[in-house]
From Swiss-Prot:
Catalytic class of the enzyme: transferase
Protein family membership: Belongs to the P-Pant transferase superfamily. AcpS family.
Keywords on record: Cytoplasm, Fatty acid biosynthesis, Fatty acid metabolism, Lipid biosynthesis, Lipid metabolism, Magnesium, Metal-binding, Transferase
Full protein name: Holo-[acyl-carrier-protein] synthase
One annotated GO biological process: fatty acid biosynthetic process
Length: 135
C-alpha cells in the first residue's frame, strides 16, 4: 500500500555554487558514508552526485509528508548504491521499520530529478527484510 510519493528536481549548477561558496554544504547534506563516496569523484560527476543526493532527500521528505526540517533532516536519510546492480537504495530513513522506500535518480544535462515512493510494509515484507539481515 502506497504511503507517499515525492518528486524533486534540482539544477546541478545551483548545488555546485552552494558547495563552492561553503565547503561545509556537502557535510550538512551527506552522511559519513555518502561523503566518502562524494570525495572520490572529480569534476562535474562530484556535483551530479551531490545534487542527486540532495534531490533524493528532498523527494523522500515530501513522500514522508514532513519536508526537511525539525522532524526529518538530511542526516536522517542515507542513500547508497547496491554493490551488484549499482542501483541507488535508501538504506537509512525515519520509519524504516514500518515503510519500504523505492527511489529513482535521473541526471540529464543541467538537471537531476528524483522520485521516492514509500510503501507500508506488510508482514511478508518485514519477514523478508529480517531474513536478509540474518544472512
Amino acid at each position: 500500500m502506497i504511503y507517499g510519493n515525492g518528486i524533486d528536481i534540482q539544477e546541478i549548477r545551483k548545488i555546485q555554487k552552494a558547495q563552492e561558496k561553503r565547503e561545509s554544504f556537502a557535510k550538512r547534506i551527506l552522511t559519513v558514508n555518502e561523503l566518502a563516496i562524494f570525495e572520490k569523484y572529480k569534476g562535474n560527476r562530484k556535483y551530479e552526485f551531490l545534487a542527486g543526493r540532495f534531490s533524493a532527500k528532498e523527494a523522500f521528505s515530501k513522500a514522508y509528508g514532513t519536508g526537511i526540517g525539525k522532524k526529518v533532516g538530511f542526516q536522517d536519510i542515507e542513500i547508497l548504491n547496491d554493490n551488484q546492480t549499482g542501483r541507488p537504495e535508501i538504506v537509512k530513513f525515519p520509519g524504516d521499520n514500518k515503510l519500504q522506500a523505492k527511489i529513482s535518480i535521473s541526471h540529464s544535462g543541467e538537471y537531476v530529478v528524483t522520485e521516492v515512493i514509500l510503501e507500508k510494509l506488510t508482514w511478508q515484507t518485514k519477514m523478508k527484510k529480517f531474513l536478509i539481515k540474518q544472512k
